[in-house]
């Protein structure tokens, strides 16, 4: 899968205004799980909550576990730390069992109080569905701009939606005149995916969505405090 692009920015006096100090900043690199949450915030936010309310009140504990990376680590403390690095908060994460769907009778991961870890449930029926979030995510293509302030920075990307299919290729699209099935269409038209997207971008970059990420420095981390689509 594609994740939010990582890029190193060197900004003179960007944050340390005294003494001409230069700071090297790494734009946070989000995985598929986080990028899925951002898509759902834009397109599955039925109560039209703002970003802060959405991540704290608009998603379930089960979905918070998913975004925290339960499919990558079994330690509850690590899951809390992952959320802290992304949002500057644990989002009041609770050590409950993890279910793919709320209606499931069996959890995929069972929480073990004695070890403070999650154990995979061998009795669960195998499924390709990992969460009840929509199986689509944000695909950032190119950085449009970076704006600095005293507390952090704002990054705007040109990007697309990516629709994931567990039994087929992922489709990146603007829901209009750009549509590409990654790793599949190239066998039909002979073009690489990179070439197709670069041609579409060069033809009219405004055909791409604009995704804006607002970061604030909290301790040593740059945490996401807002996300918008222009």
Question: Residue locations for each model-derived region?
Answer:
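Mature, Sec-exported extracytoplasmic domains of Gram-positive
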Residues: 1-230
């Amino acid at each position: 899968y594609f994740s939010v692009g990582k890029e190193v920015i060197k900004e003179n006096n960007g944050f340390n205004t005294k003494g001409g100090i230069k700071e090297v900043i790494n734009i946070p690199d989000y995985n598929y799980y986080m990028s899925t949450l951002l898509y759902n915030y834009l397109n599955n936010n039925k109560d039209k909550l703002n970003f802060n309310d959405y991540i704290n009140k608009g998603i379930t504990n089960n979905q918070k576990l998913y975004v925290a990376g339960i499919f990558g680590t079994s330690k509850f403390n690590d899951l809390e730390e992952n959320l802290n690095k992304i949002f500057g908060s644990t989002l009041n994460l609770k050590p409950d069992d993890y279910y793919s769907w709320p209606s499931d009778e069996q959890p995929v991961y069972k929480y073990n109080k004695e070890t403070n870890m999650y154990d995979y449930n061998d009795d669960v029926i195998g499924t390709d569905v990992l969460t009840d979030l929509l199986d689509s995510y944000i695909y950032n293509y190119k950085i449009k701009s970076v704006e600095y302030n005293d507390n952090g920075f704002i990054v705007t990307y040109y990007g697309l939606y990516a629709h994931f299919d567990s039994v087929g290729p992922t489709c990146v699209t603007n829901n209009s005149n750009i549509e590409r099935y990654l790793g599949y269409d190239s066998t039909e038209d002979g073009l690489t995916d990179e070439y197709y997207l670069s041609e579409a971008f060069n033809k009219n970059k405004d055909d791409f969505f604009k995704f804006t990420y607002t970061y604030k420095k909290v301790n040593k981390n740059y945490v996401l405090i807002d996300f918008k689509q222009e």
